[in-house]
Amino acid sequence: MNRNCDWQNPEITQIDREPARVTLFPYATEAQAKKAQRAFSPYYKSLNGSWDFYYSDEGVCPDGFEAVGFGVEDWDALDVPGNWQMSGYDIPQYTNVVYPIPLDPPFVPDDNPVGLYRRWFHLPSTWKDGRVYLNFDGVNGAFYVYVNGAKVGFSKVSHMPAEFEITNFVHEGENLVAVEVHKWSDATYLEDQDFWRLSGIFRDVYLLGVPQTHIRDLRADATLDESYEDGLLTVCADVTSPEGAKLAFTLYDGEKAVHTGCADAEATVKYEVRVPAVKKWTAETPNRYALAVNVLSGGEVIEAARVMIGFKKVEIRDRQLFVNGVSIKLKGVNRHDTHSQLGHVTPMESLLRDVQLMKRMNVNCVRTSHYPNDPRWLDLCDEYGLYVVDETDLECHGAQMGKWMTGDEGMVFDFSGSPEWKKAYVDRAERMVCRDRNHPSIIMWSLGNESFYGENHAAMYARIRELDPSRPIHYEGDRENHQSSDVVSVMYPAVEVVIREGESDDPRPYFMCEYAHAMGLGPGSLEEYWQAIYKYPRLIGGCVWEWVDHGMEVLTEDGETYYAYGGDFGDTPNDGNFCVDALNYPDRTPHTSVGAQKGA
């Protein structure tokens, strides 16, 4: 294998990928945008469904597989979104800390499995004069994209979207998209989370066909004035080919328009609104407003966008966490995107089940362990009312295995302090913020999980501060420098330690990003923890580990089903049943322990 390839170089984070932006779907009219049903937009085309699929354990790609005339008669059909292991290609592997491949960064084994995808799509004639973008919301593995036989681009980072402009690669009528997914890459070393190792295109794939003049990004900063009474909205819209166009802004409270205005289109349009006596967003009162932005050319609407926003202000002062001037406590959980039958694919009914259960259990906060969750999950948190600690797709826990196995205090490899990996770290943080910044539910950003601490975290912190100064930043690994975390963040402290910290004069709030491990008969001591949390203002709460068991539903020869865990598929190395350690069973049936969580 060529060890100088794109997927074994951490300084190559992408090739010809579009800059990160918010999740935004275009519509032809404001009435369409109001319904918020993207499937009915003439500017949207889903590529979910059956794709032609080829898998190679050795990473062998048939020559010319991306070509229009290549024969796929001996290929299989695979549903997208999906993880190929869940359809019998390769096996699921569960490991918590130990890397699934030998630690030799940035290199990966020569026998690196590859999954090849092909699908035809029809480009409507109405799209021929506009711009066309191809979007992948999540691909586990480093991947190349081809359209009609030509290479379009390349991307990494499993839980972040990748968008490519394909205007110059497509034509009216039938077109071919092909995707080449490499299971392991240098990115594997930064995605060592405690979960099943699964591969492939596991989130939505779709096309956007928009007018030449259109909104590329729409950032809405909705905060409060110093009295916490009036809303202050700053909108920044990036417009492609803005010449001669106008933007019309309308802010709705339900059906009532509370503000309307207009501005000439520019490359970036900044628009500010003050909303008297605004309805504020909190987890208990998730009031939202609809921001409608229409692009007008010649007085006619050519594109309509709509963003749901919430007015709130997050502050750290007096050693406490405040939302809208009120000190709050976070009764949280850690949540993975997981499904017992589909792996990392999360159907809407599963997401709804999660949010409804959380509200019933008096959960008010979710840490997206340990990567940005499906964007639809954040929509539900906005709507139902859950505070979110949004976490960068970053963990390199296995780099310290030498310390645990030999007693050596050093690490096998210091990713977080290595300049060669700085770009990859910052790329992950930047893309998270750029995707999720409009969600009112997000009250803190996280620099990742169990990745120790180094200058790369300081660079992440600085970049997030540039992009969004309105929210605090959390990182548990910054234990000594205190440069990259606005709260003291800890894991699994004893109750006595928590009480001692409550009495400390440290100026930062104290947050347990993981505590009360729920495995077996856990979680324990929740009543004692919460007696301390309520007593001491500095203690702002924590997130129980974890929300739902990761057991995989398996059918036996007798027709019975059971939940499999690490090692049940012959996967090595594995961490056994450590993936079934939550408040709920894999099918979301609550464990008996949820009573302790609800009543704490």
Where are these regions (language model features)?
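Low-complexity, Pro/Ser/Thr- and charge-rich linker/hinge segments at domain boundaries
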Residues: 202-219, 311-326
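Short strand-turn-strand beta-turns centered on an Asx-Gly dipeptide
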Residues: 146-152, 252-254, 298, 324
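Extended substrate-binding grooves/exosites of carbohydrate-active enzymes
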Residues: 1-39, 77, 87-90, 95, ...
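Accessory beta-strand-rich segments of carbohydrate-active enzymes
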Residues: 2-6, 11-14, 37-38, 52-56, ...
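Extracellular recognition modules
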Residues: 178-180, 290-294
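Surface beta-strand/loop "capping" patches
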Residues: 212-242, 588-600
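Short glycine/proline/serine/threonine-rich loop/turn segments at secondary-structure transition edges
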Residues: 127-130, 170-174, 275-288
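Beta-strand-rich binding/interaction modules
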Residues: 145-147, 230-263, 269-271, 291
